[in-house]
């Protein structure tokens, strides 16, 4: 393979794994860090932290690969996804399957350094990552499955740090599911017209004209659950200030999606990175 061909193939692999679009990895990373800090009541063990951070990026990449493989026959009909490596022919189906297996093996190799409880929970994480891309064909609620997939690092984090799954763990998972459904509905609003044409289901289609209201209710539920977690964990004032700031960001997002236009809806989705960040900073500062 010539140098130029290698570079072209490498760029295609990077695009398939979304290395050029880190937003998904960040949205997966923040709940992971929330869980690790809450479970450890402060900075977790360095080895556990490294394993989870690397695992986030490997599993997010694996999720993108299986998502594009599942959507390979429909992505060409959607404006935003038509140029992806699989529908455009830059990566073959066989190459994508090999890449998925490699990424999963790397992730599982990391998990094997943790306790048995975390290893067993990781099997559910793999199942969720595999199932999610296919759910949009059978239900209007694939975003709920995505929320569980993106949040499964929460029980895994508690298991790795404390070998315990307390009430706070499940409340945090529920908060993350509410938040994920809210921001991924914003994301789905970008593709709603295309999805209607090709028969792909989403919460954006299910919610219809009530989309903004339901997103707002989900955002409110996220904040209420985070307040409850703060109370149960006796977190300091910094955490509650971070919740107020997250609420302000949610209000800003509501303004962005008010016209249901593609670009503002996508910017609202991207804005959720700051929500995850400020909530983590609130937890982090509370344990200083």
UniProtKB/Swiss-Prot annotation:
Q: InterPro entries per the record?
A: HB_polyprenyltransferase-like, Prenyltransferase, UbiA_prenyltransferase, UbiA_prenylTrfase_CS, UbiA_sf
What EC designation does it have? 2.5.1.39
Which biological pathway? Cofactor biosynthesis; ubiquinone biosynthesis
> Signal peptide span per the entry?
none
Q: Which GO terms describe its biological process?
A: ubiquinone biosynthetic process
What gene is this protein translated from?
Answer: ubiA
The way it spans or sits in the membrane comes to:
Multi-pass membrane protein
Spell out where the chain crosses the membrane. 23-43, 46-66, 98-118, 141-161, 165-185, 213-233, 234-254, 268-288
Species name = Yersinia enterocolitica serotype O:8 / biotype 1B (strain NCTC 13174 / 8081)
Q: Which NCBIfam families match?
A: ubiA_proteo
**Any GO molecular function:** 4-hydroxybenzoate polyprenyltransferase activity
Q: What does this protein do?
A: Catalyzes the prenylation of para-hydroxybenzoate (PHB) with an all-trans polyprenyl group. Mediates the second step in the final reaction sequence of ubiquinone-8 (UQ-8) biosynthesis, which is the condensation of the polyisoprenoid side chain with PHB, generating the first membrane-bound Q intermediate 3-octaprenyl-4-hydroxybenzoate.
Know the name of this protein?
A: 4-hydroxybenzoate octaprenyltransferase
Primary enzyme class: transferase
Any idea which UniProt keywords this protein has? Cell inner membrane, Cell membrane, Magnesium, Membrane, Transferase, Transmembrane, Transmembrane helix, Ubiquinone biosynthesis
Give an example GO cellular component term for this record. plasma membrane
